[in-house]
Curated annotation (Swiss-Prot):
Lineage: Bacteria, Bacillati, Cyanobacteriota, Cyanophyceae, Nostocales
Domain of life: Bacteria
Role this protein plays: Aspartyl-tRNA synthetase with relaxed tRNA specificity since it is able to aspartylate not only its cognate tRNA(Asp) but also tRNA(Asn). Reaction proceeds in two steps: L-aspartate is first activated by ATP to form Asp-AMP and then transferred to the acceptor end of tRNA(Asp/Asn).
Name of the protein in question: Aspartate--tRNA(Asp/Asn) ligase
Residues carrying the site annotation Important for tRNA non-discrimination: 49
Record-listed L-aspartate binding positions: 197, 243, 477, 514
Length: 614
């Protein structure tokens, strides 16, 4: 250990690295045998086999095995014997062929090893590691610990691969848009004004303009439209966006999107360009050829068949609407649902009889809880027996005619062993309930192929949806989406020229053609309840721009974090972001957000009214 700590003491006097790095650790292959190389990295693991020291040296590219023994490499042996996990070292040595018995097919460098002629210690570890970083360690580390010591977490192979994958995706986006399609990258402001876009804004007081506030952008939407008015034609940006909203696994208060806007292009042309972009990303990053064009579903078809507007089509389990069959049913729950303007739908589950018991469907069961969380009051069911007859609760069986029974079996394609789960009530609740059950059952039954890639467009969204809490219409996407030209006579029921790209049940991109005429934009503002004065106050700059020759235009934005999450096979976007926030919107590494000096608040002419609970 004497030489080790002597080396540490000399670090302060070491002004430069002794030798240029010749390779990254993970790059070395058989073709490099015989070369003398210099590597830098961290000790991933150290092993002593009969007096011979083996080190796994790690950098962002991977791992390579380093060997030091007292006979062949006496100059490096003493220091090699003193090294520990996560020490930072410089190693110079010869690339040699590994002996047959020590070949390691699990790593790309597994055919070679480095005989270390020289080892320099660049830095040590002075505190006990909060968790093991080594790629050989399989312990499950608590996420809060990983986020607090993110600099250690990012050294781990999985995280290093994820961050590099993210870089590859962004690089592919830039290359295709610039080199193939002629887009230009333009930065838009981070400090802007607060505009109603759905979620809460993050707001910042202005010191030089007391009483006035900036907002961080929820998206570059308005600026990119103004860029089209400015003649920029094909714009893109890897944009940082901010939304003060409740968080979940695939949401963050600050996130990144690929933002695009194009002038003089139809909806069809925009979709085709984006299919080629996405296909290029998959081929470049994943080596996967995607068949073009992608399938399309209208919003109405997606809701009818899957109960949601972002269906996972890797498995079937499609919903069946039997409202017309049940409108005259003797079963009051079904009959009343239809009479009150609602629907009755069925989720048919092959082999459901065998795997799903009545206990799970009734109150207290897991499927009942799933339905309740979606707003359903209960679950009705029919089981198809081996003889083709049905089993269900008496209230349904006694009030189902033979004709209705046969129509249900025929429409659902139900065979012996099928379980039919019913949803009845308002359309939104029924669809949400059966969508959740569909996803839960697909996971339980192993119906989802994790290697399958299903991309599809959902098109023809409604322009507006009803906000029951505020008792008004609101834009389903945003109020700058252009209505379908055939529906201009009735904006309230109009379809939008909008399109979402869905990847294995996740919305990864959403866009639309935009309104580019002032009078249409003003009509949309009026439809969502904005008075002319409010519209002028919040969006006057956009309306003014529309007076000066605005081209037809449209665009799309991709959620970069979510797209990379799916590429990486992760379940949370926190695992593909270098420094994410928790679900409580905190950075555990820096302990942000934090308090500030009263002096700073005074300079900003603000004060906090928050009083901590005693």
């Amino acid at each position: 250990m004497g030489r080790l700590w002597h080396s540490l003491a000399n670090l302060a006097r070491k002004n430069k690295l002794t030798t240029m790095r010749t390779h990254y650790c993970g790059e070395l292959r058989q073709k490099d045998i015989g070369e003398t190389v210099t590597l830098y990295g961290w000790v991933d693991r150290r092993r002593d086999h009969g007096g011979v020291i083996f080190l796994d040296l790690r950098d962002r590219s991977g791992i390579v095995q380093v060997v030091s023994d007292p006979q062949r490499t006496p100059d490096s042996y003493e220091l090699a014997n003193s090294l520990r996990n996560e020490y930072v070292v410089e190693i110079t040595g010869r690339v040699t062929q590994r002996p047959e018995e020590s070949l390691n097919s699990r790593i790309p460098t597994g055919e070679v090893e480095i005989y270390a002629d020289k080892i320099e210690l660049l830095n040590g570890v002075r505190k006990q590691l909060p968790f093991q970083v080594s790629t050989a360690d399989t312990e499950t580390v608590r996420e809060d610990l990983r986020l607090k010591y993110r600099y250690l977490d990012l050294r781990r192979d999985r995280m290093a691969r994820n961050i590099q994958l993210r870089h590859q995706v962004v690089k592919a986006m830039r290359r295709y848009l610039e080199d193939v399609e002629g887009f230009i990258e333009v930065e838009t402001p981070i400090l802007t004004r607060s505009t109603p876009e759905g979620a809460r804004d993050y707001v910042l007081p202005s010191r030089v303009n007391p009483g006035e506030w900036f907002a961080l952008p929820q998206s570059p939407q308005l600026f990119k439209q103004i860029l089209m008015v400015s003649g920029m034609d094909r714009y893109y940006q890897i944009a940082r966006c901010f939304r003060d909203e409740d968080l979940r696994a695939d949401r963050q208060p600050e996130f990144t999107q690929l933002d695009m806007e194009m002038s003089f292009m139809s909806e069809e042309e925009i979709i085709q360009l984006n299919e080629k972009l996405v296909s290029y990303i998959f081929k470049t990053v994943k080596g996967v050829e995607l068949p073009l064009p992608f399938p399309r579903l209208t919003y109405a078809e997606a809701m009818e068949r899957y109960g949601c507007d972002k269906p996972d089509t890797r498995y079937d389990l499609q919903l069946v609407n039997v409202s017309d069959v049940m409108k005259d049913s003797g079963f009051k729950v079904f009959r009343d649902a239809v009479a009150n303007g609602g629907i009755v739908k069925i989720l048919p589950i092959p082999n459901g009889n065998e795997q799903i018991s009545n206990v799970r469907i009734k109150p207290g069961g897991d499927l009942f809880r799933e339905a309740s969380e979606a707003g359903a009051k209960g679950l009705a069911y029919i089981r198809v027996r081996e003889d083709g007859e049905i089993d269900t609760i008496g209230a349904i069986k006694d009030n189902l005619s033979e004709e209705q029974k046969q129509e249900i079996l025929q429409r659902t394609g139900a065979k012996p062993g099928h379980l039919l789960l019913f949803g009845a009530g308002d359309a939104a609740t029924v669809n949400k309930t059966l969508d959740r059950l569909r996803q839960a059952i697909a996971k339980e039954f192993g119906l989802i192929d994790p290697d399958k890639i299903n991309l599809l467009w959902v098109v023809d969204f409604p322009m507006f949806e009803w906000n029951a809490d505020e008792k008004r219409l609101e834009a389903l996407h945003h109020p700058f989406t252009a209505p379908h030209p055939d529906d201009l006579h009735d904006l309230k029921t109009a379809r939008a020229q909008a399109y979402d790209l869905v990847f294995n049940g996740f919305e990864v991109g959403g866009g639309s053609r935009r309104i580019y005429q002032r009078e249409v934009q003003e009509q949309v503002f009026e439809t969502i309840g904005l008075s002319p004065e409010e519209a002028q106050n919040k969006f006057g700059f956009l309306l003014e721009a529309f007076e000066y020759g605005t081209p037809p235009h449209g665009g799309i934005a991709y959620g970069l974090d979510r797209l990379v999450m799916l590429f990486a096979g992760e379940e949370s976007i926190r695992d593909v972001i270098a420094f994410p926030k928790t679900q409580q919107a905190r950075c555990l590494l820096t302990d942000a957000p934090s308090g500030v000096d009263v002096k700073q608040l005074k300079e900003l002419h603000v004060a906090s009214t928050y009083k901590p609970k005693s």
